[in-house]
From Swiss-Prot:
Cofactor(s) this protein requires: Zn(2+)
UniProt: GTP binding residues: R55, L56, H57, S58, E59, Q76, E97, G98, R99, T119, T154, K159
Organism: Marinomonas sp. (strain MWYL1)
EC top class named in words: hydrolase
Source domain of life: Bacteria
Protein name per Swiss-Prot or TrEMBL: GTP cyclohydrolase-2
PANTHER family for the chain: 3,4-DIHYDROXY-2-BUTANONE 4-PHOSPHATE SYNTHASE, GTP CYCLOHYDROLASE II-RELATED
Keywords annotated in UniProt: GTP-binding, Hydrolase, Metal-binding, Nucleotide-binding, Riboflavin biosynthesis, Zinc
Binding site for Zn(2+): C60, C71, C73
InterPro entries: GTP_cyclohydro_II, RibA, RibA-like_sf
GO cellular component: cytosol
Amino acid sequence: MSDLTIKRRVMIPVRAGDVMAEFISFNGDDSGKEHIGIFFEGTKAKADNSIPLVRLHSECLTGDVFGSGRCDCGEQLDEAIDRINEEGGYILYLRQEGRGIGLYAKLEAYALQDQGYDTYQANEMLHLPDDGRDFGIAAEMLQALGVSKVRLLTNNPDKAQQLIEHGIDVAELVPTKVHVNQHNRSYLETKAKRKQHTLKFD
């Protein structure tokens, strides 16, 4: 059983005030990372026993804030806000920059990618894990929120597997769109090939 408990709930208008979201902080995470739950009530009618749509979103400063074309993180976050605001559910915003290696290390990996290495090879050359994220904390956050069953908005099967291993019932995998551009196509193709992300390209 998780030691995580809810610390504070605060309503914040996002999208220039067009969307109301409840930001939720937690007690009991010894990692020192300030993971946040974001709740959207949903704008369309739903049954009382409906299963919430949930997105585990790992922090990406370059994509989420600056709209980097080297990844699809910003577009995925925007899509998650749109869809979960409509259907009701949670975004768990996890402080796992660079698939868990941190911002500075991610920039070092980008420099290696500019030399022709793929995203996973670059991490390996830096003696870092190709994906250092532990989604057990997301399961603990859901348990603290009283959520035991989810519809998971993701193309990444590892997220679902880790939630299941930590006691969360994943009722459905809901794929995100493929946000491809000239800068990130190779990156996305590598994720599909090496980590079995469910991405379908035109």
